[in-house]
Regions:
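Active-site scaffold of zinc-dependent metalloenzymes
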Residues: 26-74, 84-99
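Predominantly extracellular/secreted Zn2+-dependent metalloproteases
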Residues: 1-31
Length: 99
């Protein structure tokens, strides 16, 4: 949770439609919904595992009800896993529409 709170990517563009996020961030316009943090080494020199961080409030605010929240979480997680594996989201879940 500390990572999610401390590291929410923020962009305040003049034109929200022109925001370009890196591939490890799933976003809705200028609002980040999730971020893939790759494996690496922490400050003590210990190896770390890759993590998917979901930004709860931005995701919750985009869902009208529980069913929509479930669908959005599924879509975001599929996108993040696909990014981690270096494949298209349709490889992870062929039922997703490619937008």
């Amino acid at each position: 949770l500390d990572v999610a709170v401390d590291e929410i990517p923020r962009i305040a563009p003049k034109d929200p439609e022109s925001v370009q996020w890196p591939p490890e961030v799933v976003a809705d316009g200028p609002i980040a919904l999730a971020r893939l943090i790759p494996a690496g080494v922490d400050v003590r020199g210990n190896s770390t595992r890759a993590r998917i961080v979901l930004f709860r409030k931005p995701i919750e605010r985009r869902a009208k009800d529980t069913e929509e929240l479930t669908d959005l979480l599924h879509e975001v997680l599929v996108a993040q896993v696909a990014t981690y594996l270096g494949v298209e989201p349709s490889v992870i879940d062929p039922t997703l529409d490619d937008d």
